[in-house]
Amino acid sequence: MKKLKIIFSFLIVVSCSETNLDKFTFSTWVGAGSKFDKNTWTKKINYYDSLGISEILVGGSPDILKKIIPLANKKNIKVHGWMWTLNRPGDTIANKNPDWYAVNRKGQNSLEFRAYVDYYQWLSPFHPDAREHIINNAKKLIEVEGLESVHLDYVRFPDVILGADLQPKYNIIQDRELPEYDYGYHPIARKEFKKIFDKDPIDFDYPELSTEWRQFRLNTISTLVNEIISIAHSNNKKVTAAVFPFPEMSRQMVRQAWNDWNLDKVYPMLYQNFYRENINWIGFATKQGVSDVDFPLISGLYSPALKNPKDLERAILISKENGAQGISIFTADGLNKEQQKVFIELSNKLNQ
């Protein structure tokens, strides 16, 4: 009889685990701002809960996150700490160290020459002090009790190629890798590369053809991420990341090889309109990402490009059909009434 009880208990645990694994997660990115207001966040949490959202990726200081977590816990909503990793606009510590910043092929520093937009102020993953600063930022989030994960964003180089729909907005035609947008040429990087290959990448006529030079830059991002993950895991904290659509695409566009990272979960941003693609592309990118990694994938969706509720519904369903374990919307705060209805209906339907 005792053995039967043990077996029965085991089956219950397994059944619960399988149910949890089968759950299709609805989540959202949200900025917390610089000040915490309990009433505002209570309303936000209730709103997210009404939509079936069970996880929120919050951009805010550790102190603010500590105040949001207890409110979210009341609704069984998990809170992730959304961290801008290498792009550090307004970072007062980094600003005092111009040599920490990424350098493009023209020799321009990212603090002084800000590609595309003013908030593009990128640190170089090759500079040891910049790396230490980034890791220290992650450690502050790792220490937050009850935080579901450290959620890394902007963990890459600046876009060497923008999405097709974004280029006209900046009056740019990027039919090749232009030197002012091609980053990774920090003096430390060039010196280390030359030690190995006896070549300075700044002298390459066609640097985009050097697989060694691309891989060299990919590796420095990957080692940074995996170091953060190692520290987090040793403190029983998960690490997730918002990334470009699928590994091959992200390698080319932003020097980001996220299939080489030891993540607990990944959130590729499948914003199809940026690339002038259709809803089917979301399914393609999801399937490609799922096939490239052995950790869970959550499809990131862009609400302004899915204002038609039928498009939003199709984007969610095609993500699930192609192996995603959930979706994350940018952002739930911007959903119209019809989009909200889709969330409510599908969050119930897909998790019955």
Question: Which residue stretches match the model-derived regions?
Answer:
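Boundary/entry segment of secreted carbohydrate-active catalytic domains
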Residues: 18-44, 241-245, 304
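The substrate-binding groove and active-site-proximal loops of carbohydrate-active enzymes
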Residues: 30-34, 53-59, 116-132, 209-220, ...
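Short, acidic/polar
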Residues: 33-49, 130-141, 247-261, 281-285, ...
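Catalytic domains of carbohydrate-active enzymes, especially glycoside hydrolases
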Residues: 34, 38-64, 144-149, 260-266, ...
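Active-site-adjacent "subsite" loops/lids of carbohydrate-active enzymes
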Residues: 80-144
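Aromatic- and acidic-residue-enriched segments that line the glycan-binding/catalytic groove
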Residues: 87-115, 155-202
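Aromatic-lined carbohydrate-recognition surfaces of secreted/lumenal glycan-active proteins
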Residues: 151-158, 183-252, 296-306
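Substrate-binding cleft of secreted/luminal carbohydrate-active enzymes
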Residues: 263, 267-281, 285, 295-352
